């Protein structure tokens, strides 16, 4: 999906679920890490996280759009637009939008090392030169076995 398509979808979702126009910009922001979208109070623009579209699909992404549009329309109407406000929670239920986003699993490369002397093995996120370090248990020489990818929750 491109910026133009995102803008068009945002306008369509706004008309379909809120019966109101979306008159500002909707843009992708790949720097967003732990949130699906963000409503900007000063400019009234909405930033969306493209990773949620890739990981969870268009249906879930439309849910995030509805959530951000709840912030947008309530703020412009000078009603309670924050998560804790009653107006916001009621509008979320009315349009069937999620209150919070699911977390995107993070991909981490782990490097596996083993001691040639005692056989102890361990995982590290950072690679290091095995010639410069020794085993902490027995002082033996270390050997890199390889690396593997692990998926974890964002913090």
Curated annotation (Swiss-Prot):
GO cellular-component term (any): cytoplasm
One Pfam family per UniProt: SprT-like
Keyword annotations: Cytoplasm, Metal-binding, Zinc
GO terms of molecular function: zinc ion binding
Subcellular locations according to the entry: Cytoplasm
InterPro entries: SprT-like_domain (IPR006640), SprT_Zn_ribbon (IPR035240), Uncharacterised_SprT-like (IPR023524)
Domain SprT-like: residue ranges: 7-144
Chief location of this protein within or outside the cell: cytoplasm
Location of the active site: 68
Free-text remark on how the cofactor is bound: Binds 1 zinc ion.
A biological-process GO annotation: response to stress
Record-listed Zn(2+) binding positions: 67, 71
Required cofactor names: Zn(2+)
Domain of life: Bacteria
Family from the record: Belongs to the SprT family.
Protein's UniProt name: Protein SprT-like
The species this protein was found in: Listeria welshimeri serovar 6b (strain ATCC 35897 / DSM 20650 / CCUG 15529 / CIP 8149 / NCTC 11857 / SLCC 5334 / V8)
């Amino acid at each position: 999906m491109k910026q133009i398509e995102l803008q068009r979808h945002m306008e369509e979702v706004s008309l379909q679920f809120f019966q109101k126009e979306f008159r500002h910009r909707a843009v992708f922001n790949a720097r967003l890490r732990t949130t699906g979208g963000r409503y900007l109070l000063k400019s009234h623009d909405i930033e969306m996280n493209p990773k949620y579209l890739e990981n969870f699909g268009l249906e879930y992404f439309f849910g995030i759009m509805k959530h951000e549009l709840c912030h947008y329309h309530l703020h412009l109407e000078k009603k309670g637009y924050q998560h804790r406000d009653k107006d916001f929670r009621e509008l979320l239920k009315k349009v069937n939008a999620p209150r919070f986003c699911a977390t995107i699993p993070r991909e981490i490369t782990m490097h596996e090392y083993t001691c040639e002397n005692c056989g102890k093995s361990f995982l590290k996120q950072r690679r290091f030169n095995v010639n410069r370090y020794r085993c902490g248990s027995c002082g033996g020489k270390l050997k890199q076995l390889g690396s593997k990818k692990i998926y974890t929750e964002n913090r």
